[in-house]
Amino acid sequence: KNLPYKGKGMKKVRKIIKRVAAAALAAAVAAGLTGCGSVTSGKRIIRVSHAQSETHPEHIGLLAFKEYVEERLGDRYEVQIFPNEILGSAQKAIELTQTGAIDFVVAGTANLETFAGVYEIFSMPYLFDSEDVYKSVMQDTDYMEKVYESTDEAGFRVVTWYNAGVRNFYAKTPIHTPDDLKGKKIRVQQSPASVAMVNAFGAAAAPMGFGEVYTAIQQGVIDGAENNELALTNNKHGEVAKYYAYNKHQMVPDMLVANLKFLNGLSPEEYQIFKDAAALSTEVELKEWDKSIEAAKDIAQNKMGVEFIDVDVDAFKQKVLPLHETMLNDNPKIVDLYNHIQEINEKAKGGKQDGDNA
């Protein structure tokens, strides 16, 4: 990690190392693990892939997952975690999880839309009235289990969720009103609903993988992106985009996805341990998330020179609310979950809400 030289040459070296490592690991995984797990010293290797850095709350949550499993099943299983898209982009890693080459992958709901239409609902702008409602829905395990089973036909199942925060716009130039988005090329997740949302704001949606965003902003291919505050620091987007606007268009989870054949092959005792490990990883991630967001805001503002802008959220909301009806008409699979969320929104009205404290 600590190579004795810096600058542009160093960046090129890092890129080359990452490319070579990714190619080697992906090739090894694809060649040696197609449809089955690797066994070393009598232990089954469990491979877990995610797109974030090693300081990200999701990685810390997964370390708790690893520790919990190995403490109880260490004679049978070894959990290996691959951060930073080492095994490929989320979409590629999902495909490898389908085949069993990877056992678990952390994926955004936008990546899951192609496999189960119900996940499109999380791309709907202003779906949750507050962060309290969002967390209440996600922590209703009994209800969410039905949603998680929707990808069984594709060969994988969600086992838990992680908080991926409140998504906001950030760019090279200030964003105070929806008009400031007009004509701007904004990176979005590779989801039709996210593309429609950004276009409805008046911007030009540019769907691309998360790993490409820094260079795309730096080189002027795009003007900005939309994500939570950790993107500014963990992924260094604050080096190239200095304005972050709190328009709060989405509150989204990431999902820990497991190969279904692997889950079905576990004994009841093992299955319960993996399930408990997944629940623990969420508990750890949620605590780390809140701490990390505060730290990220401090670093972005005071060390990277990012300006945080409070905006009239309602002005942004009015631009995209018609998408609710459009999406409900176009995709019947989201209707039940949408109605369930609206019921919880209604119950929360008049009570304490913290959605404005992103």
Regions found by a protein language model. Name each.
Residues K1-I45, E71, G350-A358:
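Short, low-complexity disordered leader/linker segments with a strong preference
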Residues V29, K146-T151:
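Short, solvent-exposed secondary-structure boundary motifs
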Residues C36-D132, T151-E153, R157-A358:
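N-terminal secretory/targeting leader peptides
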Residues D132-Y148:
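A gly/proline- and charged-residue-enriched helix-loop-helix capping module
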